[in-house]
A protein has these predicted regions:
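Bacterial N-terminal signal peptides that target proteins for export
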Residues: 1-11
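Polar helix-capping/helix-linker motif
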Residues: 6, 51-52, 205-208
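Non-catalytic nucleic-acid-binding interfaces of large nucleic-acid enzymes and RNP effectors
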Residues: 12, 16
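Hydrophobic alpha-helical bundle signature of multipass membrane enzymes
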Residues: 26-180, 193, 222
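Interfacial helix-loop-helix junctions of multi-pass membrane proteins
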Residues: 172-210
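Primarily interfacial, aromatic-capped hydrophobic alpha-helices that serve as membrane anchors
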Residues: 214-224
Protein backbone atom coordinates (compact mmCIF):
# COMPACT_ATOMS: atom_id res chain seq x y z
CA UNK A 1 0.00 0.00 0.00
CA UNK A 2 1.45 3.39 -0.99
CA UNK A 3 1.95 6.29 1.39
CA UNK A 4 -0.99 8.23 0.00
CA UNK A 5 -3.23 5.14 -0.01
CA UNK A 6 -2.57 4.57 3.70
CA UNK A 7 -3.52 8.16 4.42
CA UNK A 8 -7.00 7.50 2.99
CA UNK A 9 -7.62 5.06 5.84
CA UNK A 10 -6.80 7.78 8.36
CA UNK A 11 -9.09 10.21 6.54
CA UNK A 12 -12.03 7.82 6.90
CA UNK A 13 -11.59 8.07 10.66
CA UNK A 14 -11.10 11.83 10.68
CA UNK A 15 -13.99 12.85 8.46
CA UNK A 16 -16.52 11.94 11.14
CA UNK A 17 -15.00 14.69 13.30
CA UNK A 18 -15.57 17.41 10.72
CA UNK A 19 -18.68 19.56 11.05
CA UNK A 20 -19.30 21.76 7.99
CA UNK A 21 -20.08 25.43 8.48
CA UNK A 22 -21.03 28.39 6.31
CA UNK A 23 -18.86 30.72 4.25
CA UNK A 24 -15.31 31.53 5.29
CA UNK A 25 -15.00 33.98 8.16
CA UNK A 26 -11.32 34.75 7.52
CA UNK A 27 -10.02 37.25 4.92
CA UNK A 28 -7.10 34.87 4.25
CA UNK A 29 -9.39 32.10 3.02
CA UNK A 30 -11.70 31.88 0.01
CA UNK A 31 -13.56 28.61 0.57
CA UNK A 32 -12.51 27.43 4.03
CA UNK A 33 -13.35 28.62 7.50
CA UNK A 34 -10.19 27.89 9.50
CA UNK A 35 -12.34 27.49 12.62
CA UNK A 36 -13.74 24.32 11.06
CA UNK A 37 -10.48 22.47 10.71
CA UNK A 38 -7.72 22.16 13.29
CA UNK A 39 -5.09 19.97 11.67
CA UNK A 40 -3.15 19.83 14.92
CA UNK A 41 -6.10 17.98 16.44
CA UNK A 42 -6.97 15.86 13.39
CA UNK A 43 -3.53 14.72 12.27
CA UNK A 44 -1.16 12.60 14.33
CA UNK A 45 1.94 14.49 15.45
CA UNK A 46 5.14 13.90 13.49
CA UNK A 47 7.32 11.06 14.73
CA UNK A 48 9.35 11.68 17.85
CA UNK A 49 12.99 12.38 17.04
CA UNK A 50 14.14 9.28 18.92
CA UNK A 51 11.46 6.93 17.60
CA UNK A 52 11.77 3.97 15.24
CA UNK A 53 9.38 5.73 12.84
CA UNK A 54 11.69 8.75 12.68
CA UNK A 55 14.62 6.49 11.85
CA UNK A 56 12.54 4.73 9.19
CA UNK A 57 11.57 8.11 7.71
CA UNK A 58 15.23 9.14 7.53
CA UNK A 59 16.26 5.84 5.96
CA UNK A 60 13.55 6.05 3.28
CA UNK A 61 14.56 9.57 2.30
CA UNK A 62 18.25 8.62 2.17
CA UNK A 63 17.46 5.56 0.04
CA UNK A 64 15.26 7.54 -2.37
CA UNK A 65 17.93 10.21 -2.82
CA UNK A 66 20.64 7.62 -3.35
CA UNK A 67 18.64 5.62 -5.92
CA UNK A 68 17.29 8.49 -8.00
CA UNK A 69 18.66 8.94 -11.49
CA UNK A 70 19.58 12.34 -12.98
CA UNK A 71 16.49 12.08 -15.20
CA UNK A 72 14.22 11.40 -12.21
CA UNK A 73 15.70 14.34 -10.35
CA UNK A 74 15.25 16.63 -13.35
CA UNK A 75 11.61 15.67 -13.89
CA UNK A 76 10.79 15.88 -10.18
CA UNK A 77 12.22 19.40 -10.02
CA UNK A 78 10.51 20.46 -13.26
CA UNK A 79 7.15 19.17 -12.04
CA UNK A 80 7.24 20.71 -8.57
CA UNK A 81 5.18 23.85 -9.27
CA UNK A 82 1.87 23.88 -7.40
CA UNK A 83 -0.51 24.64 -10.25
CA UNK A 84 -3.55 22.75 -11.49
CA UNK A 85 -2.06 22.86 -14.98
CA UNK A 86 0.51 20.33 -13.85
CA UNK A 87 -2.29 17.91 -14.76
CA UNK A 88 -2.15 18.83 -18.45
CA UNK A 89 -0.13 15.63 -18.92
CA UNK A 90 -3.15 13.63 -17.79
CA UNK A 91 -5.86 15.78 -19.36
CA UNK A 92 -4.39 16.96 -22.65
CA UNK A 93 -2.77 19.96 -24.36
CA UNK A 94 -5.97 22.05 -24.27
CA UNK A 95 -5.80 22.20 -20.50
CA UNK A 96 -3.93 25.49 -20.06
CA UNK A 97 -4.44 28.77 -18.25
CA UNK A 98 -4.78 30.88 -21.42
CA UNK A 99 -7.93 28.99 -22.42
CA UNK A 100 -9.41 28.53 -18.96
CA UNK A 101 -9.51 31.75 -16.91
CA UNK A 102 -12.24 30.59 -14.51
CA UNK A 103 -10.41 27.35 -13.84
CA UNK A 104 -7.18 29.27 -13.28
CA UNK A 105 -8.80 31.62 -10.78
CA UNK A 106 -10.68 28.88 -8.93
CA UNK A 107 -7.69 26.61 -8.42
CA UNK A 108 -5.49 29.53 -7.39
CA UNK A 109 -8.00 30.09 -4.57
CA UNK A 110 -7.92 26.39 -3.69
CA UNK A 111 -4.14 26.49 -3.58
CA UNK A 112 -4.15 29.58 -1.36
CA UNK A 113 -6.61 28.02 1.09
CA UNK A 114 -4.65 24.79 1.32
CA UNK A 115 -1.36 26.67 1.80
CA UNK A 116 -2.74 28.77 4.64
CA UNK A 117 -4.24 25.73 6.32
CA UNK A 118 -0.98 23.79 6.05
CA UNK A 119 1.09 26.77 7.23
CA UNK A 120 -0.83 26.78 10.52
CA UNK A 121 0.10 23.15 11.12
CA UNK A 122 3.71 23.63 10.01
CA UNK A 123 4.10 26.51 12.44
CA UNK A 124 2.62 24.47 15.27
CA UNK A 125 4.86 21.41 14.81
CA UNK A 126 8.00 23.01 13.32
CA UNK A 127 9.42 19.67 12.26
CA UNK A 128 12.90 20.10 10.77
CA UNK A 129 13.36 19.17 7.13
CA UNK A 130 15.45 16.16 6.09
CA UNK A 131 19.18 16.69 6.27
CA UNK A 132 20.41 18.80 3.37
CA UNK A 133 17.01 20.30 2.51
CA UNK A 134 17.28 24.08 2.47
CA UNK A 135 13.70 25.13 3.13
CA UNK A 136 12.52 27.88 5.45
CA UNK A 137 9.21 26.30 6.40
CA UNK A 138 8.67 23.20 8.52
CA UNK A 139 8.47 19.73 7.06
CA UNK A 140 5.19 18.43 8.51
CA UNK A 141 2.72 18.15 6.86
CA UNK A 142 3.72 18.45 3.20
CA UNK A 143 2.03 21.36 1.44
CA UNK A 144 2.75 19.83 -1.97
CA UNK A 145 1.04 16.58 -0.99
CA UNK A 146 -1.94 18.50 0.40
CA UNK A 147 -2.24 20.51 -2.80
CA UNK A 148 -1.97 17.35 -4.92
CA UNK A 149 -4.71 15.57 -2.98
CA UNK A 150 -7.15 18.49 -2.89
CA UNK A 151 -6.66 19.35 -6.55
CA UNK A 152 -6.96 15.74 -7.73
CA UNK A 153 -10.16 15.23 -5.76
CA UNK A 154 -11.77 18.38 -7.14
CA UNK A 155 -10.56 18.00 -10.71
CA UNK A 156 -11.72 14.40 -10.90
CA UNK A 157 -15.23 15.50 -9.90
CA UNK A 158 -15.59 17.35 -13.19
CA UNK A 159 -13.47 14.93 -15.23
CA UNK A 160 -14.49 11.49 -13.96
CA UNK A 161 -13.27 9.72 -17.10
CA UNK A 162 -9.73 10.94 -16.32
CA UNK A 163 -9.87 10.14 -12.62
CA UNK A 164 -7.30 7.34 -12.64
CA UNK A 165 -4.77 9.37 -14.61
CA UNK A 166 -5.31 12.44 -12.43
CA UNK A 167 -4.82 10.54 -9.18
CA UNK A 168 -1.83 8.66 -10.55
CA UNK A 169 -0.15 11.92 -11.43
CA UNK A 170 -1.10 13.47 -8.09
CA UNK A 171 0.47 10.57 -6.19
CA UNK A 172 3.67 10.93 -8.21
CA UNK A 173 3.70 14.69 -7.54
CA UNK A 174 3.33 14.09 -3.79
CA UNK A 175 5.83 11.26 -3.49
CA UNK A 176 8.42 13.14 -5.55
CA UNK A 177 8.92 15.25 -2.42
CA UNK A 178 10.65 12.23 -0.89
CA UNK A 179 12.75 11.62 -4.00
CA UNK A 180 13.83 15.27 -3.90
CA UNK A 181 14.89 14.84 -0.28
CA UNK A 182 12.75 17.72 1.00
CA UNK A 183 10.07 15.73 2.86
CA UNK A 184 9.76 12.56 4.90
CA UNK A 185 7.21 9.86 4.01
CA UNK A 186 5.16 10.75 7.10
CA UNK A 187 5.05 14.39 5.91
CA UNK A 188 3.62 13.27 2.58
CA UNK A 189 1.04 10.96 4.15
CA UNK A 190 -0.14 13.68 6.54
CA UNK A 191 -0.22 16.26 3.74
CA UNK A 192 -2.35 13.98 1.57
CA UNK A 193 -4.81 13.49 4.43
CA UNK A 194 -4.91 17.24 5.10
CA UNK A 195 -5.62 17.98 1.44
CA UNK A 196 -8.42 15.43 1.43
CA UNK A 197 -9.98 17.03 4.49
CA UNK A 198 -9.64 20.49 2.92
CA UNK A 199 -11.33 19.39 -0.32
CA UNK A 200 -14.21 17.83 1.61
CA UNK A 201 -14.66 21.00 3.66
CA UNK A 202 -14.58 23.29 0.62
CA UNK A 203 -17.38 21.35 -1.05
CA UNK A 204 -19.76 22.58 1.66
CA UNK A 205 -18.99 26.28 1.09
CA UNK A 206 -21.52 28.30 -0.94
CA UNK A 207 -18.91 30.44 -2.72
CA UNK A 208 -17.03 27.28 -3.64
CA UNK A 209 -20.18 25.67 -5.05
CA UNK A 210 -20.89 28.71 -7.22
CA UNK A 211 -17.33 28.93 -8.57
CA UNK A 212 -17.02 25.18 -9.02
CA UNK A 213 -20.13 25.16 -11.20
CA UNK A 214 -18.49 27.81 -13.39
CA UNK A 215 -15.35 25.67 -13.67
CA UNK A 216 -17.41 22.64 -14.62
CA UNK A 217 -19.14 24.61 -17.37
CA UNK A 218 -15.88 26.10 -18.65
CA UNK A 219 -14.19 22.70 -18.88
CA UNK A 220 -17.16 21.22 -20.69
CA UNK A 221 -17.18 24.11 -23.17
CA UNK A 222 -13.50 23.40 -23.82
CA UNK A 223 -14.41 19.75 -24.56
CA UNK A 224 -11.85 18.44 -22.10
Amino acid sequence: MSIVSRSAVLFALLVALFVPAGASASPLFYYLDPRQIDLTALLPPPPDVSSAQERADEEQVAAAVMRRSPAQLYHAEEDSMRTVFFFSKSIGPGFDSARLPLTTRFFSHVRSDVEHLIDQAKTYWERPRPSGAHKARGSYPSGHAAFAAATAILLSQVMPSKRDAIFGQARMFAENRILLGVHYPSDVAAGWTAGTIAAYAMMHDRAFQHDFADVDAELHRASL
